[in-house]
From Swiss-Prot:
Provenance organism: Saimiri sciureus (Common squirrel monkey)
Residues annotated as transmembrane: 9-25
Biological function: Catalyzes the transfer of L-fucose, from a guanosine diphosphate-beta-L-fucose, to the terminal galactose residue of glycoconjugates through an alpha(1,2) linkage leading to H antigen synthesis that is an intermediate substrate in the synthesis of ABO blood group antigens. H antigen is essential for maturation of the glomerular layer of the main olfactory bulb, in cell migration and early cell-cell contacts during tumor associated angiogenesis. Preferentially fucosylates soluble lactose and to a lesser extent fucosylates glycolipids gangliosides GA1 and GM1a.
Glycosylated residue positions: N66, N302, N328
Family: Belongs to the glycosyltransferase 11 family.
Pfam families: Glyco_transf_11
Spans within the Cytoplasmic topological domain: 1-8
Name of this protein: Galactoside alpha-(1,2)-fucosyltransferase 1
Pathway of action: Protein modification; protein glycosylation
The reaction(s) this protein catalyses: a beta-D-galactosyl-(1->4)-N-acetyl-beta-D-glucosaminyl derivative + GDP-beta-L-fucose = an alpha-L-Fuc-(1->2)-beta-D-Gal-(1->4)-beta-D-GlcNAc derivative + GDP + H(+); a ganglioside GA1 + GDP-beta-L-fucose = a ganglioside Fuc-GA1 + GDP + H(+); a beta-D-Gal-(1->3)-beta-D-GlcNAc-(1->3)-beta-D-Gal-(1->4)-beta-D-Glc-(1<->1')-Cer(d18:1(4E)) + GDP-beta-L-fucose = alpha-L-fucosyl-(1->2)- beta-D-galactosyl-(1->3)-N-acetyl-beta-D-glucosaminyl-(1->3)-beta-D-galactosyl-(1->4)-beta-D-glucosyl-(1<->1')-N-acylsphing-4-enine + GDP + H(+); a neolactoside nLc4Cer(d18:1(4E)) + GDP-beta-L-fucose = a neolactoside IV(2)-alpha-Fuc-nLc4Cer(d18:1(4E)) + GDP + H(+)
Compartments (UniProt record): Golgi apparatus, Golgi stack membrane
Taxonomic placement: Eukaryota, Metazoa, Chordata, Craniata, Vertebrata
Length: 366
C-alpha cells in the first residue's frame, strides 16, 4: 500500500494527463473546423472508410502496408473549402464536378463534393475528390455563387474561402486546360469498361460479317426534350435526316465504321434510323435510371455523333476522335441562347450540322 502522499501525487498526475488530452482534442477540433476540414477519419487505411465522409490526410501520416491507394491530399498551398450543389442528371453532375475541380484549382481552394454527387458518379468513375460530411456542410458559413455556363474573368478571382457553387456548368471553357486530369477523373471502373468492350467486340458488319474497324457512338436524346425544346426553348431535337447526314459524314471519312446507337428513345431509333447498310447497331438499353451502361459504350467508341444534352457532350469529350453535333437547334430569339453559348459548348474542332427548324416556323410568325 502506497503512502497517502504518493497516492495524491499519482492522482494529480493522472488528472493533469486527462485535462491535457481534453485540451488537445478541443484545440485540434477547432483548428480543423477553422480550416474547413471535416476529419471523419484520419488515414492510413482508406479501405476502412465507408463514404460519404470527409477524408483528409495529415502531412506525414504513415501508410498501411495493405493500403491499395493513397489518401486524397490537397497541396499545402490550397486553403478554404469549396463545393458545388449536385443538381440534374448524370451529365449535369459530371459538368458540375469538372467545373468545381477546375475553378477550385484556379483559385487555390480545396474542393469537396457532396454525398449525392458521390452517389451518382463514384459507382461509375474513379473520381478522387473527397466527400464533405453532412454535419460539416451544415455548419460551414457558405457564400453561394450561381455559375453561368461559360468561363468568365470574375471566376478566376473569387475570394470567398467557403464557397458553394450551383448551376449547370458544362462548358469546356472551364476545364479544357485540365483535359487529361478530367479524363483521368472520369476513368470508368474496370468492370464497366470491360463489359462495354465485350459488347463492341461482338459487333459485326451486317453484309460481310467482318469486324468493324471504327466504332462511332451515337447518342440520340429524346425523352422530356420532346416537349421541353419546342414548348420552352423554341428548339428542336435531332430528326432522322440529321442522323443520316451525320452517319454519311463518317462513312465518307472512315473505312467500315459501325454506328453504336444509344438513346432514351430506342423504339424511335429503330423505327427512324436507316439500318439497311448493315452498319447500324442498336446497342443501348435506354434505361435512364442506370445510364452508365450506355455511357460506357459511347465512351469506348472511337468517334461520336451527339444530338443535344450534356450526356452526349461527355461521351464525346471522353471518347476523343471526331465529333459531329446538332447545331443551331433553336430559333434566333430563343431564351435558351441567354444561358447557352454554342461556342462555349462545342469544341472548335467538332463539326456542326444545322438542325431542321421547319417545325418551329409557326412559332416564328408574328
Amino acid at each position: 500500500m502506497w503512502p497517502r502522499s504518493h497516492r495524491h501525487l499519482c492522482l494529480a498526475f493522472l488528472l493533469v494527463c486527462v485535462l491535457s488530452a481534453i485540451s488537445f482534442l478541443i484545440h485540434f477540433h477547432q483548428d480543423s473546423i477553422r480550416h474547413g476540414l471535416g476529419l471523419s477519419v484520419l488515414c492510413p487505411d482508406r479501405r476502412l472508410v465507408t463514404p460519404p465522409v470527409a477524408i483528409f490526410c495529415l502531412p506525414g501520416t504513415p501508410m498501411s502496408p495493405n493500403t491499395s491507394s493513397p489518401c486524397p491530399q490537397h497541396p499545402a498551398s490550397l486553403s478554404g473549402t469549396w463545393t458545388i450543389y449536385p443538381d440534374g442528371r448524370f451529365g449535369n453532375q459530371m459538368g458540375q464536378y469538372a467545373t468545381l475541380l477546375a475553378l477550385a484549382q484556379l483559385n487555390g481552394r480545396r474542393a469537396f463534393i457532396l454525398p449525392a454527387m458521390h452517389a451518382a458518379l463514384a459507382p461509375v468513375f474513379r473520381i478522387t475528390l473527397p466527400v464533405l460530411a453532412p454535419e460539416v456542410d451544415s455548419r460551414t458559413p457558405w457564400q453561394e455563387l450561381r455559375l453561368h455556363d461559360w468561363m468568365s474573368e470574375e471566376y478566376a478571382d473569387l475570394g470567398d474561402p467557403f464557397l458553394k457553387l450551383s448551376g449547370f456548368p458544362c462548358s469546356w471553357t472551364f476545364f479544357h486546360h485540365l483535359r487529361e486530369q478530367i479524363r483521368s477523373e472520369f476513368t470508368l471502373h474496370d468492370h464497366l469498361r470491360e463489359e462495354a468492350q465485350s459488347v463492341l467486340r461482338r459487333l459485326r458488319l451486317g453484309r460481310s460479317g467482318a469486324r468493324p474497324r471504327t466504332f462511332v457512338g451515337v447518342h440520340v436524346r429524346r425523352g422530356d426534350y420532346l416537349q421541353v425544346m419546342p414548348q420552352r426553348w423554341k428548339g428542336v431535337v435531332a430528326n432522322s435526316a440529321y442522323l443520316r447526314e451525320a452517319m454519311d459524314w463518317f462513312r465518307a471519312r472512315h473505312e467500315a465504321p459501325v454506328f453504336v446507337v444509344t438513346s432514351n428513345g430506342m423504339e424511335w431509333c429503330r423505327e427512324n434510323i436507316d439500318a439497311s447498310k448493315g452498319d447500324v447497331m442498336f446497342a443501348g438499353d435506354g434505361q435512364e435510371a442506370s445510364p452508365w451502361k450506355d455511357f460506357a459504350l459511347l465512351a469506348q467508341c472511337n468517334h461520336t455523333i451527339m444530338t443535344i444534352g450534356t450526356f452526349g457532350f461527355w461521351a464525346a469529350y471522353l471518347a476523343g476522335g471526331d465529333t459531329v453535333y446538332l447545331a443551331n437547334f433553336t430559333l434566333p430569339d430563343s431564351e435558351f441562347l441567354k444561358i447557352f453559348k454554342p461556342e462555349a459548348a462545342f469544341l472548335p474542332e467538332w463539326v456542326g450540322i444545322n438542325a431542321d427548324l421547319s417545325p418551329l416556323w409557326p412559332l416564328a410568325e408574328p
